[in-house]
Amino acid sequence: MPRRRVIGQRKILPDPKFGSELLAKFVNILMVDGKKSTAESIVYSALETLAQRSGKSELEAFEVALENVRPTVEVKSRRVGGSTYQVPVEVRPVRRNALAMRWIVEAARKRGDKSMALRLANELSDAAENKGTAVKKREDVHRMAEANKAFAHYRWLSLRSFSHQAGASSKQPALGYLN
């Protein structure tokens, strides 16, 4: 525990083109070696391509793709006695966004298309249609949580460590077995 006051999370400046903090965070996750302008041009180009394909606005299409990749539950390792259990826990909203964006960027980097903008556009397009590597990753995480729901009663161990975070206990669990 820190002896001094707990520092709050820094506010991120909204994206200059669309005014979205979520998109600014996405640009930061995509950025390599501090080259923000390069990351922004890749994201804007990918969103333009995505908007042309979907017929929606750039931000709307991005939000749909992100929503389809956001996980609701994940597993955390908890040591009880001599055994380690994979305990399903609900994912907090900020972490949902962070995981979804990270998975989309990772999946786009692994694709074999010509440019990064095209790879990102294709991955976002696949995510909007509920297919693709990032959506598969979310389904794998959900499948792991479902397979380990027998250990959900150990959840109090993981909640105890998150009790200092606001809203940890006020939210309803995403799945019934987390009650």
Curated annotation (Swiss-Prot):
InterPro entries: Ribosomal_uS7 (IPR000235), Ribosomal_uS7_bac/org-type (IPR005717), Ribosomal_uS7_CS (IPR020606), Ribosomal_uS7_dom (IPR023798), Ribosomal_uS7_dom_sf (IPR036823). Part of the 30S ribosomal subunit. Contacts proteins S9 and S11. Cross-links to IF3 and the P and E site tRNAs. It comes from Escherichia coli (strain K12). The gene is rpsG. Disulfide bonds: none annotated. One of the primary rRNA binding proteins, it binds directly to 16S rRNA where it nucleates assembly of the head domain of the 30S subunit. Is located at the subunit interface close to the decoding center, where it has been shown to contact mRNA. Has been shown to contact tRNA in both the P and E sites; it probably blocks exit of the E site tRNA. Protein S7 is also a translational repressor protein; it regulates the expression of the str operon members to different degrees by binding to its mRNA. GO terms for molecular function: mRNA binding; rRNA binding; structural constituent of ribosome; tRNA binding. GO terms for cellular component: cytoplasm; cytosol; cytosolic small ribosomal subunit; membrane; ribosome. Signal peptide: none annotated. The strain K12 sequence is shown. Keywords: Ribonucleoprotein, Ribosomal protein, RNA-binding, rRNA-binding, tRNA-binding. One of its GO terms (biological process) is cytoplasmic translation. This is Small ribosomal subunit protein uS7. Belongs to the universal ribosomal protein uS7 family.
